[in-house]
Swiss-Prot record:
EC numbers: 3.6.1.31
Subcellular location(s) of the protein: Cytoplasm
Domain of life per record: Bacteria
A Pfam family reported for this protein in Swiss-Prot or TrEMBL: PRA-PH
Name of the protein described by the UniProt record: Phosphoribosyl-ATP pyrophosphatase
Organism, as annotated: Zymomonas mobilis subsp. mobilis (strain ATCC 31821 / ZM4 / CP4)
Similarity comment: Belongs to the PRA-PH family.
């Protein structure tokens, strides 16, 4: 999936966000709030893991698409985007995963 594809998905989400919740699934997600959207991301993540463990490539791809879509909705809901995620990934490029994790603030 290219950055252009994700940008297109984000533009569709932004447009559908303006629609009536009765007419648009995307709008209904925003209408129900961040907690509901986050729950949907969690559900799709679990379904993706289950499909992967079942070694069902087609289901894995389908569930991964659902996960990416719902993640895009969550990012939009929180005022973020995949571009910001890509910037963070670029920032981490060349940094050891262990070193990056160790440098994070302790919570």
């Amino acid at each position: 999936m290219s950055e252009e594809t994700l940008a297109y998905i984000e533009s569709v989400i932004a447009e559908r966000r303006k629609a009536s919740p009765e007419d648009s699934y995307v709008s209904s997600l925003f209408h129900r709030g961040t907690a509901h959207i986050a729950q949907k991301v969690g559900e799709e993540a679990v379904e993706t893991v289950i499909a992967a463990l079942a070694q069902d490539k087609k289901s894995l791809e389908s569930e991964a698409a659902d996960l990416i879509f719902h993640l895009a909705v969550l990012l939009a809901d929180r005022g973020s985007s995949f571009e910001n995620v890509f910037s963070e990934l670029r920032r981490r490029e060349g940094v050891s995963g262990h070193a990056e994790k160790a440098a994070r603030p302790k919570s």
